[in-house]
A protein has these predicted regions:
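His/Asp/Glu-enriched, well-ordered alpha-helical/loop segment
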Residues: 135, 332-418
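Histidine-rich, glycine-flanked metal-binding segment
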Residues: 43-57, 66, 70-112
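Divalent metal-dependent hydrolysis catalytic cores, especially in the metallo-beta-lactamase
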Residues: 144-169, 184-191, 231-241, 260, ...
Length: 471
């Protein structure tokens, strides 16, 4: 060995290069199903009854400028939606529409895929709410309902919730899916998993009770992952602090269950998380060049979320980090992290991480986030592709969302402007369609009229409990 080292130093022998192991793949549940099996429209891919979904009939968006999210140039086209799917994209002038279709003229407007936000906290408590009121489940749910409206009126048709109060994001997901409340699709992570003294365990106590799962030791980290899986998680969210064994256990368990892992961490914890095989790193927190190189080599993705820190810098004049993290940074440093990741070829998604009452600023924060992408070298169309197709891929939903191509779910945004030229035009929301349902018209949430259900007869008298006579 000593001779080999001496020879290598002399340039005579090349020592083998130690490389990280290949990224451990996420288990694909679809491989065990027949190709005709219909599955749930989320990363869980649960088999569901093969019945038509979405509203009856068909919808035609006629004469608009189509930005389809694939990276192709914007063109004039007509979009055909049948029930909850895009079935055709017709060239300008074509009129072969389905019989009885509802036709909406969108001439001069831009048709594009609904936007996706990869980093939300739907029920994070408001300023001024104390620990008792802020942690009340009913209040948390109502906050979530309100914020879903802010999102969908901003053209966002899918949100990934990466840390909220217990069951709240799961119930919100159910009610949106059933069209009982207006909003975007919800992809919840469940509780944030961290170690004692980690992110959310120290600080000002602003995290909701039930939003954090403290785990100690590798076996407990595995158990915490399984707990979120049982709740119905679409992704697993972890945060520093963690040991090498703990993060490896979490990733191993999540990938076995078919779920990706995203990590909120900083400095050397990023190196540790990437080496363990996490799928994504959140935020622009400090990291070394070697960590960025390792992310690129392992295919680790990133959701930079620059906009919340911009808000903090603008409102408070600076950021000092939480007591559990011990670092400082600036707008320039954050932007440089984004620039370095882009230059390294890391796949980047778009998320806002809006907390407290910042949701009320929408859609401006989302547009600001996209502007940071442009600032580091993306073209405007490339930034919009990141917000649609790339975000869908990072959700593990690239086969169903993110582009307006035949076979994809009909999540559509219609804008009064040219957002592929000027990002500020994203604020001019005209119509939003989610799962084939029109949920925003003329820029406002549209709630269909309640259609009374015919009560069966005879039925019980509400006061006496006796059956009423037939009329």
């Amino acid at each position: 060995m000593r001779i080999q080292v001496l020879a290598a130093l002399a340039g005579l022998v090349a020592l083998p290069v130690m490389r990280p192991e290949a990224q451990r793949p996420v288990s694909d549940r679809r491989r065990w199903m027949d190709s005709t099996t219909q599955t749930s429209d989320d990363p869980q891919r649960l088999p569901v009854q093969n019945v038509p979904r979405g509203p009856d009939g068909s919808l035609v968006l006629l004469g608009g400028r189509l930005f389809d999210g694939t990276g192709a140039p914007t063109r004039e086209a007509t979009l055909i939606i049948v029930r909850n799917k895009v079935t055709a994209v017709l060239p300008k002038g074509a009129r072969n529409f389905p019989n009885g279709a509802r036709i909406i003229d969108v001439t001069g407007k831009t048709i594009m895929p609904g936007l996706i936000d990869l980093h939300t906290h739907l029920d994070y408590r408001e300023p001024g709410e104390d620990g008792v009121s802020g942690n009340d489940v009913s209040r948390a749910t109502l906050r979530g309902v309100e914020r879903l409206r802010f999102f969908v009126e901003s053209g966002i048709t899918s949100v990934r919730d990466v840390g909220s109060h217990g069951v709240v994001p799961f119930r919100l997901k159910e009610w949106v899916s059933a069209n009982r409340i207006p909003g975007p699709r919800v992809f919840p992570s469940g509780t944030l998993i961290t170690g004692t003294g980690g992110h959310g365990d120290l600080g000002d106590g602003s995290f909701l009770a039930g939003a954090i799962r403290l785990a100690e030791g590798a076996d407990d980290w595995r158990k915490a992952v399984r707990e979120n899986f049982v709740m119905g998680a679409d992704v697993i969210k972890i945060a520093s602090h963690f040991s090498k064994a703990e993060v490896e256990a979490a990733v191993d368990e999540a990938h076995d269950l078919g779920l990706k892992v995203t990590c909120d961490c900083e400095t050397f914890y990023i190196d540790r998380a990437v080496a363990a095989g996490v799928d994504m790193i959140e935020h622009p927190l400090p990291r070394s060049d070697s960590a960025i190189a390792l992310m690129a080599q392992r295919g680790t993705q990133a959701d930079p979320t620059l906009v919340p820190y911009i808000i903090i810098f603008d409102e408070r004049g600076g950021y000092w980090g939480s007591s559990s993290r011990r670092f400082t940074f600036s707008k320039e440093a954050n932007l440089n992290v984004l620039r370095r990741m882009k230059q390294a070829g890391i796949k980047l998604g778009v998320g806002t991480d809006l907390v407290t009452n910042w949701y009320r600023y929408m859609p401006a924060p989302y547009i600001t986030e996209l502007e940071q992408f442009v600032a580091v070298g993306y073209t405007v169309p490339e930034a919009l592709v990141a917000a649609t197709r790339t975000n869908a891929e990072l959700l593990d939903m690239g086969d169903k969302l993110g582009t307006l191509t035949p076979g994809k779910l009909a999540d559509v945004l219609v804008v009064n402007g040219r957002p592929d030229v000027n990002l500020q035009d994203l604020a001019k929301v005209d119509m939003v369609i989610r799962d084939g349902n029109v949920v925003v018209q003329d820029g406002r949430v549209w709630v269909p009229r309640h259609v009374p259900v015919v009560a069966p007869r005879p039925y019980a008298d509400s006061t006496s409990g006796k059956a009423r006579p037939k009329s």
